[in-house]
Amino acid sequence: KLFSFGNFLTVWRPMEKTVVLSKPDCVQKKIMGEVIKRFENQGFQVIGCKMMRLDEAILRDHYSHLTEFPFFSEILGFMQSSPILAIALEGEAIIQKVRDLIGPTDSTAAAKGTVRGDLGEDKMRNVVHASDAPEAAEAELKRFFDAGELMA
């Protein structure tokens, strides 16, 4: 399905795909199901889902914008402390809708009712990562999923 539309008053909008990573704190707290349920309750379509351990190479690629910061080694350690759950979602304007549902990076600043506001602890232990733009989503889909692993 390439496009969805409501009626003659709405504009055709392309379906988007995005990536959500349930981070180690999410896995360790056993709240992965709660996170997925929140996405499904919004009508988001899960098109891929897999547990994986992230090696240093994939993390350096994923967090390339942070490698020069002194806290980068802490990010590496945290993201390798347990497996993560990679989730691919599809829907209309899904990148922004997911960002709205999860809340800002800093869980202490996230509103109640958002994933991070309800379940996160701080900037690092904030339960999930989500693609922030179409270009990032495209790169992350390729980084975390092989072509045959997506059901759309």
Q: What are these model-predicted stretches?
A:
Residues 2:
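Cationic, low-complexity basic patches in intrinsically disordered or flexible, solvent-exposed regions
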Residues 8-152:
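Non-catalytic terminal and connector segments of soluble metabolic enzymes
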